[in-house]
């Protein structure tokens, strides 16, 4: 080795591996208003100190790698590195802790959920020094949220488009989810809308299969919408699923929906991807279409308590990427959802300013500034007996969606829709009169069923149906 090379190697650079905590654990750091803040639930491998594990998360999700590199000297690590600035224990879990990490805003591309997640929940989740890692929450600063367009329209604009106020909206997923012909599918849509529902919905896995191609489904559903509107005098909609194998095909389907004059389309935002979702949201905003979002695949990511990503993070990401509705659990139905946690991310979807509240799983105060809100959709195993609880839990700004709870009515689809509409109107009227829905809910439904034979039949069919399993996702 030449003397010249030896001299260079000795100036400002020392090859080798050093502990992450020496660079990325900074307990004295004061967070900035422009930082993206993350709360990670960390389960390190035995023998790995909490400070080292937290620093490793900050490093591997920002500027760090496993060894010191020459090119560190060509940038300012102090400006660009993520910092683990606080560590706190998890009650009842000796081997876990919450690591708080601050990321400088310049690490992220403007208006790109894809880029944000590629860093924060990228390779770090496969890091060997960690047994498990879960992203519990993010604080998105206004400086970053203002680079996103957000929901295509938002709650108030949707109500104005539909001319529906003062109550939750009612929906229904057409069942069986797969196997119907386009004409029979359209007939079911018509019967449900005529019976009193505001919306019907494609199931998430209805795209363009051999038994029902997308164009045929769109045509028959549009016919059902316009016929039911003419008969009822109400504005109706059907969530036409535009999800496809390519972004180009997805946009083509949305264009056809717009040409038909329908009010709303749908996207599976996790299986379709955030880039596709944001592209579709931009199209919907520019062309007057509402956008319904289904969260298929979310439980793969968010259901395990120790690893993955909490749904409140996915909900925040969706609000930035763009959607007017998103499925958010039911609390009372067949799908996962603990009450306080669910209400926490429902507020994150709808409200402008949400205070930190650890009792509901909210780790950071979130300020959305002027970004429109998203309507939470309660769907999955719900029926007329759940209507008082759903009305009380979710309030007016929500969509209550009954699939089997409409189409499973013993008299058919239209009577099933009538039963749900009567139950909802009864609950809203009782609430407006000052009655307690949580305490008097069953009595309110029984009273309404005395003058609605459709509701009485529904009450009889589902009087014994319960889904009583302990929620996996608890505080």
From Swiss-Prot:
Q: Which residues carry this modification: N6-carboxylysine?
A: 201
GO aspect biological process, one term: reductive pentose-phosphate cycle
Q: Which PROSITE patterns match?
A: RUBISCO_LARGE
Question: What family does the database annotate?
Answer: Belongs to the RuBisCO large chain family. Type I subfamily.
Location comes to: Plastid, Chloroplast
Q: What residues bear N6,N6,N6-trimethyllysine in this entry? A: 14
Complex formation: Heterohexadecamer of 8 large chains and 8 small chains; disulfide-linked. The disulfide link is formed within the large subunit homodimers.
Give the misc comment.
Answer: The basic functional RuBisCO is composed of a large chain homodimer in a 'head-to-tail' conformation. In form I RuBisCO this homodimer is arranged in a barrel-like tetramer with the small subunits forming a tetrameric 'cap' on each end of the 'barrel'.
- Its predominant location is plastid
Q: What is this protein called?
A: Ribulose bisphosphate carboxylase large chain
Protein function? RuBisCO catalyzes two reactions: the carboxylation of D-ribulose 1,5-bisphosphate, the primary event in carbon dioxide fixation, as well as the oxidative fragmentation of the pentose substrate in the photorespiration process. Both reactions occur simultaneously and in competition at the same active site.
An example GO CC term for this entry is:
chloroplast
Q: Where is this site: Transition state stabilizer?
A: 334
- By its UniProt entry, which NCBIfam families does this protein fall under? PRK04208.1
Originating gene: rbcL
Origin organism of this chain?
Answer: Calycanthus floridus var. glaucus
Residues forming the catalytic site: 175, 294
- Cofactor: record remark: Binds 1 Mg(2+) ion per subunit.
The keyword Protein biosynthesis is assigned to this record: no
So what EC number does this one have? 4.1.1.39
Which SUPFAM superfamilies does this chain map to? Answer: RuBisCo, C-terminal domain (SSF51649), RuBisCO, large subunit, small (N-terminal) domain (SSF54966)
**Propeptide position ranges:** 1-2
In alphabetical order, the GO MF annotations are: magnesium ion binding; monooxygenase activity; ribulose-bisphosphate carboxylase activity
Enumerate the residues binding Mg(2+). Answer: 201, 203-204
């Amino acid at each position: 080795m030449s003397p010249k090379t030896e001299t260079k190697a000795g100036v400002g650079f020392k090859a080798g591996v050093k502990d992450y905590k020496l660079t990325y654990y900074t307990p004295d750091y004061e967070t900035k208003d422009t930082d993206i803040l993350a709360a990670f639930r960390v389960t390190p491998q035995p023998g790995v100190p909490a400070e080292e594990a937290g620093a490793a998360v900050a490093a591997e999700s920002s500027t760090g790698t496993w060894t010191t590199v020459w090119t560190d000297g060509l940038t300012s690590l102090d400006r660009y590195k993520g910092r683990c600035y606080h560590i706190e224990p998890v009650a009842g879990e000796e081997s876990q802790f919450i690591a708080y990490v601050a990321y400088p805003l310049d690490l992220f591309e403007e208006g790109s959920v894809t880029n944000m997640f590629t860093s924060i929940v990228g390779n770090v989740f496969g890091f060997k020094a960690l047994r498990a890692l879960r992203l519990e929450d993010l604080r998105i600063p206004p400086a970053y949220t203002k680079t996103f367009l957000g929901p295509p329209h938002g709650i108030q604009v949707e109500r104005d488009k539909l001319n529906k106020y003062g109550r939750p909206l009612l929906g229904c997923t057409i069942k069986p989810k797969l196997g119907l012909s386009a004409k029979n599918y359209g007939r079911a849509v018509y019967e449900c809308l005529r019976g009193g529902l505001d919306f019907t919905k494609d199931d998430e896995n209805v795209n363009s299969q051999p038994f029902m191609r997308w164009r045929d489904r769109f045509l028959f559903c549009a016919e059902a919408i316009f016929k039911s509107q003419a008969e009822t005098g109400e504005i109706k909609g059907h969530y036409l699923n535009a999800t496809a194998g390519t972004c180009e095909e997805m946009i083509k389907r949305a264009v056809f929906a717009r040409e038909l004059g329908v009010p709303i389309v749908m996207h599976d935002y996790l299986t379709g991807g955030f880039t596709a979702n944001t592209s579709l949201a931009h199209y919907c905003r520019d062309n007057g279409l509402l956008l319904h979002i289904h969260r298929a695949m979310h439980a793969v990511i968010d259901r395990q308590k120790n690893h993955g990503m909490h749904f409140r993070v996915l909900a925040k990401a969706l609000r930035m990427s763009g959607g007017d509705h998103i499925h958010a659990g039911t609390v009372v139905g067949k799908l996962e959802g603990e009450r306080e946690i669910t209400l926490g991310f429902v507020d994150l979807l709808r409200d402008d300013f949400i205070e930190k509240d650890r009792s509901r799983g909210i780790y950071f105060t979130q300020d959305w500034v002027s970004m429109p809100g998203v309507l939470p959709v309660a769907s999955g195993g719900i029926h007329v007996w759940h209507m008082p609880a759903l009305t009380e839990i979710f309030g007016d700004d929500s969509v209550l969606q009954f699939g089997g709870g409409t189409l499973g009515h013993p008299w058919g689809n239209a009577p099933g829709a009538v039963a749900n509409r009567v139950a909802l109107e009864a609950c809203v009227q009782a609430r407006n009169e000052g009655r307690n829905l949580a305490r008097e809910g069953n009595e309110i439904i029984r009273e309404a069923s005395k003058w609605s034979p459709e509701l009485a039949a529904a009450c009889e069919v589902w009087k014994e149906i319960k889904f009583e399993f302990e929620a996996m996702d608890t505080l």
